[in-house]
């Protein structure tokens, strides 16, 4: 009888494992669908913004505040299906619009090709760090505290440079930010495949912010060095 009970327990455990794995695969697929949708809407937002460049530049603070409001709306609607997806796409669309002044600066200094170059580099970084997260034997969860401290340092340095206005200091900040968010890509990717997020929305916004910040950092570096070449 005891042997029979143990056999049943093993079968139940195997069934639970298969069910959990199936749910995790579905979770990951949904996450990357939302991530892809976020990138698409951010691109649409940026294109519409570039088509109305003067208006976006004139009201850039309005769009920035709207983006912040949408982000906090997303954070507060995490547990509300439907609304959280709407807020995710509202936030990502607005983040594309608020990129327009930076995109315009880079295009003016280095041409449209520089934007595609930055996007290509960001995509390569994202792909490489994602593969690393999936292949490595290391538990990247241990990086969490270090990455958060580094993020605070980068934010503080960015605020300081708002007053200093140093191009070279900005290059250092952008370089550090690119490295930091590249590491965050690996960190967040591993957390996603381990099922550490509560919902695909949470996971998708983490990946989106990682991608966006690497892209912004590369754009800033290209813009600054293009200006120095002239």
Curated annotation (Swiss-Prot):
Membrane-spanning residues: 34-54, 56-76, 87-107, 111-131, 146-166, 167-187, 205-225
Annotated membrane topology: Multi-pass membrane protein
Record bears the keyword Cell membrane: yes
InterPro entries: Bax_inhibitor_1-related (IPR006214)
Signal peptide: none
GO CC annotations, alphabetized: plasma membrane
Subcellular location: Cell membrane
Pfam family for this entry, one: Bax1-I
Record's keyword terms, sorted: Cell membrane, Membrane, Transmembrane, Transmembrane helix
Family: Belongs to the BI1 family.
Protein name according to UniProt: Uncharacterized protein jhp_0854
Organism lineage: Bacteria, Pseudomonadati, Campylobacterota, Epsilonproteobacteria, Campylobacterales
């Amino acid at each position: 009888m005891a042997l029979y009970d143990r056999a049943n327990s093993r079968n139940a455990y195997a069934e639970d494992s298969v069910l959990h794995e199936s749910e995790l695969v579905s979770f990951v697929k949904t996450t990357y669908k939302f991530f892809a949708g976020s990138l698409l809407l951010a691109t649409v937002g940026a294109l519409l913004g570039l088509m109305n460049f003067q208006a976006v530049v004139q009201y850039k603070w309005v769009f920035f505040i709207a983006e912040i409001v949408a982000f906090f709306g997303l954070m507060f609607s995490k547990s509300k299906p439907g609304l959280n997806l709407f807020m995710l796409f509202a936030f990502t669309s607005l983040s594309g619009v608020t990129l327009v002044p930076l995109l315009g600066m880079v295009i003016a200094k280095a041409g449209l090709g520089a934007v595609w170059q930055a996007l290509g580099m960001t995509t390569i970084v994202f792909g490489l760090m994602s593969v690393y997260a999936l292949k490595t034997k290391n538990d990247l969860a241990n990086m969490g505290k270090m990455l958060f401290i580094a993020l605070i340092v980068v934010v503080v340095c960015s605020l300081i440079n708002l007053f200093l206005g140093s191009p070279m200091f900005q290059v250092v900040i952008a370089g550090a930010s690119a490295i930091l968010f590249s590491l965050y890509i690996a960190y967040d990717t591993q957390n996603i495949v381990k099922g550490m997020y509560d919902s695909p929305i949470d996971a998708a916004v983490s990946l989106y912010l990682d991608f966006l910040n690497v892209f912004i950092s590369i754009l800033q570096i290209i813009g600054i060095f293009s200006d120095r070449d002239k």
